[in-house]
Amino acid sequence: MIRIINGQTYFTSKYPNIIIPEKPIPHLILKHIRYKPDQVLLVDGLTFKEYSSHFVADTIEKVACGLNKLNIKKGDVLGVILPNLPEYVPIFHGTLLMGGITSLVNPDYTIEELSHTLATVSPRYLAVTLAVYEKIKNDLKRVFPSVEKVILVDIAGQTLKEIDQLTLSSDGIVMSFNQLTNNNGKDYPIVRIDLTKDTAIIPFSSGTTGLFKGVCLSHYNLVSNTYQTQTIETSTYKKNDSVIGVLPFFHSFGLMLHIMLMVKQGYRIVTLPKFEPVRFLELIKKYKVAMSFIVPPIAIMFAKSPIVDKFDLSSLRTLFCGAAPLGSEIEDLIKERFKGRLVIKQGYGATELSPCCFVTPNGLVKSGSSGTLLPNLLAKIISSETGENLGMGEKGEICIKGPNVMLGYYNNEKATNEVIDKDGFLKTGDIGYVDEDGYFFIIDRSKELIKCKGFQVPPAELEALLLSHPKVADACVVGLSKGDMGEVPRGFVVIKQNESLTEKELLDWAHPKIANYKHFRGGIFFIPAIPKSATGKLLRKNLKDFNNLKL
């Protein structure tokens, strides 16, 4: 697990390297799902409509055929502005089958956010719901001058009649998904793909630390990470297991796990466009869901919400948490609540890594760890001050090298060179360490560390402390400038419903548990909700206005 190269320390996977198939991802998907043509592959969590593997495979090819009729060319971009719907699967893979590029964004984005993300990659086509179209139609030509066709996808609560009326009154720019797929699925060419050089998708970096950047991922990036993760993650699944697709498909974490890995493996995926606690728990009960990929806010629900006790969740065996670190306190609360029968696993990565690099292995689960290195990867941990490689147990910035590292940022060579070093290692910007068993632990983002009196204070550590208070529902910690001290921690807390708590009570409880330099000298503010991204990452930058308050 430790390799010394030219006197420098590197970390290798405990797993042997695997062979990465040299085929585009849609070819592999079609091959695998046609093995079990009659098996239910997708379920619409709103309508309960079921889709067989055979139907999904046929629809992928019908999307390819429909796009061919629209004269799609290799490298053309189809912007996907959709929630989690069954149609996401054929739209995604059908576009890639034609050599097109899918660019994925949050359907809740405003026009301004769309202009800073999707519009920058000049999409030729858009796939949207009626609600999204209503939001963008008046600004379509201004924000998306490159768009030639908008494909409307039906969602529960909208009628096909409404969509058909729009297609007739939109100067020919709008067509329905049904119109796109109204063909035999056979009339499309075989497009030659350069696996390592051709971009397959352009998701956008989270924007939690700055402006959005388009991340160019190749077919080989996607295939590599699907097979790397499969090596560890699917070995305990059973033949007819169901998973619930609540993680946003527009995010690389939800996309790879559901649209690629779970589809390829043939597990039944119940799609849910938006996380609603009651519906989410009802679907777990109804479809006997065995596995759920979640983010920390959902984990907090499993740990603390009384609503969980109202549902039969006996089918649930595993929770896999990613997108942001999950503190050991919340993990332990879930285990205690479910009397140890639930396996809590974590994964770690970044959009730039397609996205996974660590996954909790089967067997020994270490509370608070993000897991061990996936196959075919090399890691190093570097000092944020000297840039030198560090050893086991030493804390520094985690850097990853392997076949899942992105091609680069879209039209941004400068930003690419800032995060990928001369040896091909991606600098994650996250601070962590590796223990003697090869388990990695994430402490915090290097840019978010609070530097107080010469000490580095990880906000995540203080957030975990606040979350362990029985009356606290959610929490976020940021750094606040204060003269000679540098920065001091300031806390933001959401109190549990029907509970009361004062700042003094919370400070008196917290301060004896932490070193003096970690004390909340910036105070604690009680707010209605903690700002988070769609994938559950804390948006500390959104609390900037509070930081402008004078101490």
Swiss-Prot record:
The gene is 4cl3. One of its GO terms (biological process) is phenylpropanoid metabolic process. The lineage of its organism: Eukaryota, Amoebozoa, Evosea, Eumycetozoa, Dictyostelia. It catalyses: (E)-4-coumarate + ATP + CoA = (E)-4-coumaroyl-CoA + AMP + diphosphate; (E)-4-coumarate + ATP + H(+) = (E)-4-coumaroyl-AMP + diphosphate; (E)-4-coumaroyl-AMP + CoA = (E)-4-coumaroyl-CoA + AMP + H(+). Its cofactor is Mg(2+). It is an enzyme of class 6 (ligase). Carboxylate--CoA ligase that may use 4-coumarate as substrate. Follows a two-step reaction mechanism, wherein the carboxylate substrate first undergoes adenylation by ATP, followed by a thioesterification in the presence of CoA to yield the final CoA thioester. Residues 276-346 are annotated as: SBD1. Belongs to the ATP-dependent AMP-binding enzyme family. Gene3D superfamilies: 3.30.300.30, 3.40.50.980, Luciferase, Domain 3. Both substrate-binding domains (SBD1 and SBD2) are involved in the substrate recognition, and are sufficient to confer the substrate specificity. CoA binds at residues 274, 453-454. It comes from the Eukaryota. CDD domains: Firefly_Luc_like (cd05911). Keywords: ATP-binding, Ligase, Magnesium, Nucleotide-binding, Phenylpropanoid metabolism. ATP binds at residues 205-209, 213, 346-347, 351, 430, 445, 537. Pathway: Phytoalexin biosynthesis; 3,4',5-trihydroxystilbene biosynthesis; 3,4',5-trihydroxystilbene from trans-4-coumarate: step 1/2. The keyword ATP-binding applies. This is Probable 4-coumarate--CoA ligase 3. One of its GO terms (molecular function) is CoA-ligase activity.
